[in-house]
Amino acid sequence: MTNIRKTHPLLKIINSSFVDLPAPSSLSTWWNFGSLLGVCLAVQILTGLFLAMHYTSDTATAFNSVTHICRDVNYGWLIRYLHAIGASMFFICLYLHVGRGLYYGSYTYSETWNVGIILLFAVMATAFMGYVLPWGQMSFWGATVITNLLSAIPYIGTDLVQWIWGGFSVDKATLTRFFAFHFLLPFIVAALVIVHLLFLHETGSNNPTGIPSDSDMIPFHPYYTIKDILGFLIMLTALSGLVLFSPDLLGDPDNYTPANPSITPPHIKPEWYFLFAYAILRSIPNKLGGVLALVMSILILAVIPMLHTSKQRSMMFRPLSQCLFWLLMAVLLTLTWIGGQPVEHPFIIIGQTASMLYFLIILVLMPITSLTENYLLKW
């Protein structure tokens, strides 16, 4: 008698995706982040569902409803901080996952990579709208500043902004629609994750060497299930540590003040995971130019497969490209730091230099370095 997991219409799909899936034997810890992102998404949907049971999306009561969750709901403080810090964990895993793809050349699976970029945009949109919901000072002013950027679009910009706001300023209509979209988007993300996996399983996983591994495959279960569970434990320990010991470490103190349209905070800034893009936006004095640079800072990922000039897929055996990759990481960390600083000397020039380097490394230096390595290896 054949095993039910191999014959049942539903179970055999799960079996071929998570149990009997042939996987390269050399996958390192950098391949753990896909499953960690799945756990993050599950945690966010669950905690978000419980928060939505108590939250009210009205400008008069939104801030108080969040306070009520933290003070009066059983373990409401725990659910709220798991959700807030869970978002930070989500982005840490997301950026490491994308970084892994860049380093090991996973972007050559173009369908998987492109769905991944759409996923990144969807998660960023979800996080932005979620940050508006507590209706604190930074929520309100963050929403005002970021949505107002769309007014830089020629001809339709102003109408578009008013359409998104549902009026002439960020108000009740804006908060209500942001809550509706913030609730809906994670389920769209979950559907896109299935598409992402579907495309990945068409080709099979990449591996650290970038060399086809068809001759050396092992079953996903038990080898990588055990490895993934270890990853879950480490991440959930870090999440619990932050939630229980320093829940406000990654937040902004201004968000403990109710939204007030007549008082502008001294430094308007988004959550830490958007600071690199915010720094690129601020480094260009022109509004439309800044918006284009902001969008391109993420959309540039779609161009990377076309700029792959190396004869090797992975950077594992390419020391010059490795140096450039880590320089790019240093530039991104610098941008993240600059995004949280006030707009004054010397932060302005540092931000502009780092922004220029970011695009220069990806668009010019990496392809040239790859060609140089080909030449040095006489390929």
UniProtKB/Swiss-Prot annotation:
Q: How is the cofactor bound?
A: Binds 2 heme b groups non-covalently.
Q: How does it sit in the membrane?
A: Multi-pass membrane protein
Cite the InterPro entries for this sequence.
Answer: Cyt_b/b6_C, Cyt_b/b6_C_sf, Cyt_b/b6_N, Cytb/b6-like_sf, Cytochrome_b, Cytochrome_b_C_euk/bac, Cytochrome_b_N_euk/bac, Di-haem_cyt_TM
| Transmembrane regions | 33-53, 77-98, 113-133, 178-198, 226-246, 288-308, 320-340, 347-367
Q: Which GO terms describe its cellular component?
A: mitochondrial inner membrane; respiratory chain complex III
Q: Which cofactor does it need?
A: heme b
For this protein, the record's CDD domains field holds:
cytochrome_b_C (cd00290), Cytochrome_b_N (cd00284)
**The keyword Lyase appears for this protein:** no
Q: Name one GO molecular function term.
A: metal ion binding
Q: Which residues bind heme b b562?
A: 83, 182
> GO:BP terms for this protein?
mitochondrial electron transport, ubiquinol to cytochrome c
Residues that bind a ubiquinone, according to the entry?
A: 201
Q: Which UniProt keywords apply?
A: Electron transport, Heme, Iron, Membrane, Metal-binding, Mitochondrion, Mitochondrion inner membrane, Respiratory chain, Transmembrane, Transmembrane helix, Transport, Ubiquinone
User: In which compartments does the protein localize?
Assistant: Mitochondrion inner membrane
Q: Where does heme b b566 bind?
A: 97, 196
Name the major location: mitochondrion
| Coiled-coil ranges from the UniProt annotation | none
PANTHER family registered for this protein in UniProt: CYTOCHROME B
Q: What else is known?
A: Heme 1 (or BL or b562) is low-potential and absorbs at about 562 nm, and heme 2 (or BH or b566) is high-potential and absorbs at about 566 nm.
Q: Which family does it belong to?
A: Belongs to the cytochrome b family.
Relate the protein's function as given in its record.
Component of the ubiquinol-cytochrome c reductase complex (complex III or cytochrome b-c1 complex) that is part of the mitochondrial respiratory chain. The b-c1 complex mediates electron transfer from ubiquinol to cytochrome c. Contributes to the generation of a proton gradient across the mitochondrial membrane that is then used for ATP synthesis.
Record note on quaternary structure: The cytochrome bc1 complex contains 11 subunits: 3 respiratory subunits (MT-CYB, CYC1 and UQCRFS1), 2 core proteins (UQCRC1 and UQCRC2) and 6 low-molecular weight proteins (UQCRH/QCR6, UQCRB/QCR7, UQCRQ/QCR8, UQCR10/QCR9, UQCR11/QCR10 and a cleavage product of UQCRFS1). This cytochrome bc1 complex then forms a dimer.
The protein here is known as: Cytochrome b
Q: What organism is listed for this UniProt entry?
A: Rhinophylla pumilio (Dwarf little fruit bat)
Q: Coding gene?
A: MT-CYB
